[in-house]
């Protein structure tokens, strides 16, 4: 018997502590709503709700614990009723109950709801009993359909929001390539100083002049049969052009290209 009494006392102490924490959280939240509503933010409200939810879950765990005795089996009986002011009750109830008389006992030790609430519950129970099973099934199906449509809309909005955030955060360029291009254009980083052959400048040993640019120029030579006077004039023009530029190598590519262009279809 003493063991059960100790367990009951420990359970009551734990419940009083949990309820006191919940009460303090509620008082602080109500104070914010009444006095700090102008600068109250939504994250702060969510934090307050999360704190209250966690404390209520802890209280439920204490009540459902195996070591917690069944409080419903315990009976509370007032041993003394007095119309006089009781300071101890004032301290325990924080000034809310000054006396413990016949007027307040039915309210504070009530095991049933208030009469108004009890009457409303009876009306709702009577209305639920009058509904047929078919009508109730239709109402349930209608409610399920509405909930499904609402869930679909919420899921669609969530997907669209995620896709929009992905489009905004998607990177459309490579930072490495961009930095390399900027460095090449601004500072010439990574560019080669060599010139391609045939673009001017001194030629390396072993390289020829224009013949290196046109490797198939020799294949463009086409035998021509010209009259003797035109052939002499043609050869004289070539010799004059070669003689007018002393110190340069004679170029036959110009003549060959010219002759090829005059008869493109001759084989």
UniProtKB/Swiss-Prot annotation:
GO terms for biological process: protein ubiquitination; regulation of transcription by RNA polymerase II. One of its GO terms (molecular function) is transcription coregulator activity. InterPro entries: Mediatior_Med8_fun/met. It comes from the Eukaryota. The keyword Secreted does not apply. It is found in: Nucleus. Residues 190-267 are annotated as: Disordered. Pfam families: Med8. Residues 227-245 have a biased composition (Polar residues). GO terms for cellular component: mediator complex. Residues 1-26, 116-160 form a coiled coil. Keywords: Activator, Coiled coil, Nucleus, Transcription, Transcription regulation, Ubl conjugation pathway. Component of the Mediator complex. May be part of a multisubunit E3 ubiquitin-protein ligase complex. Component of the Mediator complex, a coactivator involved in the regulated transcription of nearly all RNA polymerase II-dependent genes. Mediator functions as a bridge to convey information from gene-specific regulatory proteins to the basal RNA polymerase II transcription machinery. Mediator is recruited to promoters by direct interactions with regulatory proteins and serves as a scaffold for the assembly of a functional preinitiation complex with RNA polymerase II and the general transcription factors. Belongs to the Mediator complex subunit 8 family. This is Mediator of RNA polymerase II transcription subunit 8. The gene is med8.
